[in-house]
């Protein structure tokens, strides 16, 4: 195996900040030059969170799905000693009104395999709820039968490396627009590693990279941004001609709903 970089909206979200509709609109310059991404508009991806260890090191992304819950990748290995940082754009700034949220419980999908990277999803129950605002709100979850066809133009965001050999990750949240691929097309690059609980995007001059893991791949549905993928793995050089691989959220929704209902 190549050295892989392991990279229904709830009514409780409240009418003021409905899911998937940022108060500050994102501006995506189509298939822009996160490798070959661009700075996001500050606050325009309000569900994007940074997962940080106790030293403040950003190691993965995640997405708010309600005031109490964050979804990320299982391979991120989140612990309750880590924190969720919401409302952040520039990790080099002390001026932002960020929320540093403790994690009460980590629910890793029991079917996750580090060998196949199947079922790469973890849910984080926050110890104290996020306070929704202009820059902090939830992404919509798809239903299990939602269809997001190949060719759909979607967006991914994160503080991951902008070059695979970069010494550090960018301070400012990066974004890129990229098309979904069919699994058949994706298998041309990745072969049998691609399973039905994965979805591919990119190979279009942009790529997710190390540090983006756990973050969102979102597509618009009925005018609201919906979580279609969770950044999972891809080329060890973050090649922009190889598709990035994401956990396919529609296939994982039954497990998500079960955990949310029981907790």
Curated annotation (Swiss-Prot):
PROSITE patterns per the UniProt record, alphabetical: TRYPSIN_DOM, TRYPSIN_HIS, TRYPSIN_SER
Organism superkingdom: Eukaryota
Main location: secreted
Listed GO MF terms: serine-type endopeptidase activity
Listed GO CC annotations: extracellular region
Keyword check for Protease: yes
Catalyzed reactions: Preferential cleavage: Tyr-|-Xaa, Trp-|-Xaa, Phe-|-Xaa, Leu-|-Xaa
Protein name per UniProt: Chymotrypsinogen B
UniProt source species: Homo sapiens (Human)
Record gene name: CTRB1
